[in-house]
Amino acid sequence: MTMMDMNFKYCHKIMKKHSKSFSYAFDLLPEDQRKAVWAIYAVCRKIDDSIDVYGDIQFLNQIKEDIQSIEKYPYEHHHFQSDRRIMMALQHVAQHKNIAFQSFYNLIDTVYKDQHFTMFETDAELFGYCYGVAGTVGEVLTPILSDHETHQTYDVARRLGESLQLINILRDVGEDFDNERVYFSKQRLKQYEVDIAEVYQNGVNNHYIDLWEYYAAIAEKDFQDVMDQIKVFSIEAQPIIELAARIYIEILDEVRQANYTLHERVFVDKRKKAKLFHEINSKYHRI
């Protein structure tokens, strides 16, 4: 195993640890594509964790400077400051793919702002956040998952990322509240007459369910729009993207089956993932 292979293996471990659903799906890509996904996921995870886990703004600055070095001089030797193994893997990817570096910087800017979280006044602000933390990831992955990236390809990948982030929010309402965060907008909370603190303390009510389903309908519509345009991605990537997205959309039904609880994180079990895999395998005949 070469040193570069070890770098990619390190990135893969990060992805498997933090997102079993993504790993389950994207590990089915051809080798070069899945390695690129591992590297990009690992970079994005380190960006996310720089503040939430490490509480280290300097580490986030180092990540940004390392990415800038790769963008400017992709073939030069660099003394990376953040995580050398991840950055070497990203540099290798950047030498072969047209990486949308600005999307990395947009993600970093969102993480900077998230240090001083305040509730969103409107849904527009919420959806802007979903772009910043997840739509950006879709943009960065676009050259890996398509043969000829176009404006439409970037748009579809961006919308998929935003949809998956909204699903994350719908899954983690209680966990986020424990961390003193409510991502639903004040505008929509007022419209549906919902106080998350009250729901957390006293249990789910019809007002909360209606609010939750309002946002779930948006995520489901975006998911369907992506599925309707999935042919913008490469033949190899189409079944993988559909598998990842369908595993994620299944989370919404898991929340429903758990009676919208705020006190337990739901997940899609291995049996259901395997069922989805076989359905999509039959559809595409080539996973």
From Swiss-Prot:
The keyword Cell wall biogenesis/degradation does not apply. Mg(2+) 2 binds at N168, D172. Binds 2 Mg(2+) ions per subunit. Mg(2+) 1 binds at D48, D52. It holds the Pfam family SQS_PSY. It catalyses: 2 (2E,6E)-farnesyl diphosphate = 15-cis-4,4'-diapophytoene + 2 diphosphate. Its EC number is 2.5.1.96. Disulfide bonds: none annotated. (2E,6E)-farnesyl diphosphate 1 binds at H18, S19, K20, S21, Y41, R45, R171, Y248. Pathway: Carotenoid biosynthesis; staphyloxanthin biosynthesis; staphyloxanthin from farnesyl diphosphate: step 1/5. Keywords: Carotenoid biosynthesis, Magnesium, Metal-binding, Transferase, Virulence. One of its GO terms (biological process) is carotenoid biosynthetic process. GO terms for molecular function: geranylgeranyl diphosphate synthase activity; metal ion binding; squalene synthase [NAD(P)H] activity. It comes from the Bacteria. (2E,6E)-farnesyl diphosphate 2 binds at R45, Q165. InterPro entries: Isoprenoid_synthase_dom_sf, Squ/phyt_synthse, Squalene/phytoene_synthase_CS, Trans_IPPS_bact-type, Trans_IPPS_HH. The keyword Zinc-finger does not apply. Its cofactor is Mg(2+). Belongs to the phytoene/squalene synthase family. CrtM subfamily. Involved in the biosynthesis of the yellow-orange carotenoid staphyloxanthin, which plays a role in the virulence via its protective function against oxidative stress. Catalyzes the head-to-head condensation of two molecules of farnesyl diphosphate (FPP) into the colorless C(30) carotenoid 4,4'-diapophytoene (dehydrosqualene). This is 4,4'-diapophytoene synthase. It comes from Staphylococcus aureus (strain N315). The gene is crtM.
